[in-house]
């Protein structure tokens, strides 16, 4: 049981001292998030160099505070004090301090100058990646990527590993995950996905004319509040690559990008990022925020929240029964110009795509498997940066039967490597597995939810279920225990496969 502290429950001084220093570190980490958000959304181009220096300075400062011996003394003193607490409080405090010590031990392995260098390099790399993508020329980014790969390998060496360097990086996003285990999971998943892809129907776009950005913006601005993220605690902007970030309590930022020829891209981008922000919003509502227990559990769990709202909700019939008339109004279209059945079938169409973020939910995981294989070999030294375009294009031909025309639609399409985020990609598919299982359990407990979705656009039952079973748990439980407690069983990919098979069957019947 979680015991919330209040003014009448004064903390022992040792716990108060530890929390004060932790929250100082957290405060500056959030300041760094503000700098990052601004650099992607608002900052003029010529501010990049100095902004990189600012970000590096904050990263170095927070790292020095985290690794300072005096902070360790505060943690150790706090741990001794917990022995005097009642059992109901002691177990949570011990878990909190255990998590923090794991983070501190990891931070202790990285020199401060390395942290500053990595932070500055990734901020500079993003601008060069964006320019290279715009020019469709990998060579404009390859030298910087070479530096990022070098530093990422160095980071893996600092962290240490048993089997391969990639494991050390994977662990930073999904604690305890191992590349060889992921490989087995992905191989089995791929075998199940291939026959689904083969029988899945493809539908043509029902949009016969471009949809102005202003109309798309009007519709997209409605989505977060409909799902449960209020305008008082969030805002939606435009960026080169959709993302979401938490700048602190009551301040969640979402971005998307718009295309007049593909209005669904912005819509599903907003649904996805809103899912992330709803999770962060739920975490910040936990008692005694901020502390190590009120952080997100893993990126796999984080992605489960975004993919659930994007797919299980956003591609469902009840969701579009409610949103369809609103879409017509905002897009200034008639029913004859955009028939409901054509729209719904297209939303759930399966078609091999060159672009991951525009991929349907059936083939999406094949994109993740491709990226996992490439970045694993890259970090493990089996692949060279200069060969990435050729390797990428070959794998796309093998997996999708598609020819890549330029680097922008190939190796440069994703932002992740410019962030030094090697090991991130597998968490998307883990998130898909978790989300299907979570949603299945929710519908069992709330069998009438689809009616509330369709008739009222009421998603409060779902959000409440997620708040209770996922968001409010923070890092209190392990990943395995969270999934088991929420669904009654360990994580199982069968729910994702079943969901995809049922979805393909549904739209095939209506064909």
Task: Please tell me what each predicted stretch does.
Residues 18, 160, 272, 306, ...:
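Divalent metal-coordination and catalytic microenvironments
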Residues 118-265, 462, 504:
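Contiguous, non-catalytic segments that form substrate-binding/exosite surfaces or channel walls
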Residues 2-11, 30-33, 46, 50, ...:
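C-terminal, non-catalytic "cap/extension" segments appended to globular domains
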Residues 2-175, 501-508:
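A well-structured
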Residues 265-283, 303-307:
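Active-site recognition of the HExxH zinc-binding catalytic motif
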Residues 295-336:
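Post-HExxH zinc-binding segment in Zn-dependent metallohydrolases
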Residues 50, 114-117, 144-147, 212, ...:
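Secondary-structure capping and boundary motifs in well-ordered enzyme cores
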Residues 186, 190, 213-217, 223, ...:
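All-alpha helical catalytic cores of prenyl diphosphate-utilizing isoprenoid enzymes
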């Amino acid at each position: 049981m979680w015991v919330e502290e209040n003014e009448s429950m004064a903390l022992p001084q040792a716990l108060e001292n530890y929390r004060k220093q932790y929250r100082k570190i957290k405060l500056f980490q959030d300041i760094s998030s503000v700098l990052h958000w601004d650099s992607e959304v608002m900052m003029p181009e010529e501010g990049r160099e100095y902004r990189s220096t600012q970000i590096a300075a904050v990263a170095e400062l927070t790292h020095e505070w985290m690794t300072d011996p005096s902070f360790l003394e505060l943690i150790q003193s706090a741990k001794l004090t917990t022995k005097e607490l009642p059992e109901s409080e002691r177990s949570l405090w011990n878990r909190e301090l255990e998590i923090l010590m794991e983070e501190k031990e990891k931070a202790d392995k990285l020199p401060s100058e390395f942290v500053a260098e990595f932070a500055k390099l990734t901020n500079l790399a993003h601008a060069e990646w964006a320019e290279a993508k715009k020019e469709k020329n990998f060579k404009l980014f390859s030298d910087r990527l070479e530096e990022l790969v070098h530093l990422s390998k160095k980071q893996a060496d600092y962290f240490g590993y048993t089997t391969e360097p990639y494991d050390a990086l994977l662990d930073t996003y999904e604690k305890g995950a191992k590349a060889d285990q992921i490989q087995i999971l992905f191989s089995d998943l791929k075998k199940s996905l291939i026959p689904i892809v083969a029988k899945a129907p493809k539908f043509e776009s029902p949009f016969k004319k471009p949809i102005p950005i202003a109309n798309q913006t009007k519709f997209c601005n409605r989505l977060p509040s409909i799902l449960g993220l209020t305008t008082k605690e969030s805002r939606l902007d435009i960026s080169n690559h959709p993302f979401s970030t938490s700048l602190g309590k009551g301040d969640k930022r979402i971005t998307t990008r718009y295309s007049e020829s593909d209005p669904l891209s912005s819509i599903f981008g907003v649904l996805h990022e809103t899912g992330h922000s709803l999770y962060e919003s739920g975490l910040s509502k936990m008692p005694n925020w901020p502390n190590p227990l009120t952080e997100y559990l893993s990126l796999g769990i984080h992605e489960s929240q975004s993919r659930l709202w994007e797919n299980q909700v956003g591609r469902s019939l009840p969701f579009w029964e409610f949103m369809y008339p609103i879409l017509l109004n905002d897009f200034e279209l008639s029913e004859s110009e955009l028939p409901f059945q054509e729209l719904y079938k297209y939303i759930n169409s399966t078609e091999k795509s060159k672009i991951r973020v525009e991929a349907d939910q059936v083939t999406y995981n094949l994109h993740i498997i491709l990226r996992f294989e490439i970045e694993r070999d890259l970090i493990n030294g089996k692949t060279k940066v200069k060969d990435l375009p050729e390797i990428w294009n070959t794998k796309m031909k093998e997996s999708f039967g598609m020819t890549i025309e330029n680097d922008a639609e190939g190796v440069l399409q994703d932002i992740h490597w410019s962030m030094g985020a090697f090991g991130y990609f597998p968490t998307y598919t883990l998130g898909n597995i978790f989300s299907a299982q979570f949603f299945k359990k929710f519908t069992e407990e709330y069998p009438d939810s689809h009616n509330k979705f369709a008739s009222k656009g009421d998603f409060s039952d779902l959000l409440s279920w997620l708040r209770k079973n996922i968001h409010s748990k923070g890092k209190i439980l392990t990943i395995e225990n969270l999934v088991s407690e929420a669904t009654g069983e360990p994580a199982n990919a069968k729910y994702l496969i079943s969901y995809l098979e049922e979805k393909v069957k549904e739209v095939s019947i209506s064909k």
